[in-house]
């Protein structure tokens, strides 16, 4: 599971996920990409589940890049605990996703295979996505 190894602070404020992605919006490494159309949070488990679905489908061929990293801790208090007494302990890690963010990239496979692999991966994710192809000269 993906999570940071060294942290300056263990817990963060909730914040608001607004705006659109300005960085990490183009296909940079592979030939095909899975781009976020909606906004939301991807947990480390969801990122891994989608990666596994793609890897199983393309079998031995191709290479996959994960372009997002879950660097935000989400805390949770235990069940039936009274309010107050500080912030809960870290439960899991998420990546905040804005529209336009490239989630995964792939190369070394045909477009049909990549399209199907990304379709299987998108089924594991809670946000709307689209398939993109690298533009010539990009």
Swiss-Prot record:
- Keywords for this protein: Ribonucleoprotein, Ribosomal protein, RNA-binding, rRNA-binding, tRNA-binding
Among the GO molecular function terms of this UniProt record, one is: tRNA binding
Determine if rRNA-binding is one of this entry's keywords.
yes
User: Single GO cellular component annotation?
Assistant: cytosolic large ribosomal subunit
**GO BP, one annotated term:** translation
**Per its UniProt record, what Pfam families does this chain match?**
Ribosomal_L16
Q: Which CDD domains match?
A: Ribosomal_L16_L10e
Main function: Binds 23S rRNA and is also seen to make contacts with the A and possibly P site tRNAs.
Looking up HAMAP family in the UniProt record yields:
Ribosomal_uL16
Subunit structure of this entry? Part of the 50S ribosomal subunit.
**To which protein family does this belong?**
Belongs to the universal ribosomal protein uL16 family.
NCBIfam families in UniProt: rplP_bact (TIGR01164)
State the protein's name: Large ribosomal subunit protein uL16
**Which organism encodes this protein?**
Laribacter hongkongensis (strain HLHK9)
């Amino acid at each position: 599971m993906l999570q940071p190894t060294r942290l300056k602070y263990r817990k963060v404020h909730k914040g608001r996920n607004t705006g659109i992605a300005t960085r990490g919006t183009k296909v940079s490494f592979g030939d095909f990409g899975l781009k976020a159309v909606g906004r939301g949070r991807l947990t480390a488990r969801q990122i891994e589940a989608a990666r596994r679905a793609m890897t199983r489908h393309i079998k031995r061929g191709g290479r996959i890049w994960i372009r997002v990293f879950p660097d935000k801790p989400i805390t949770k208090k235990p069940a039936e605990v009274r309010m107050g007494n500080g912030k809960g302990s870290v439960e899991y890690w998420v990546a905040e996703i804005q529209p336009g963010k490239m989630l995964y990239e792939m190369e070394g496979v045909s477009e049909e295979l990549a399209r199907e692999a990304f379709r299987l991966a998108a089924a594991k994710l809670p946000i709307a996505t689209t398939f993109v192809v690298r533009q010539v000269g990009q």
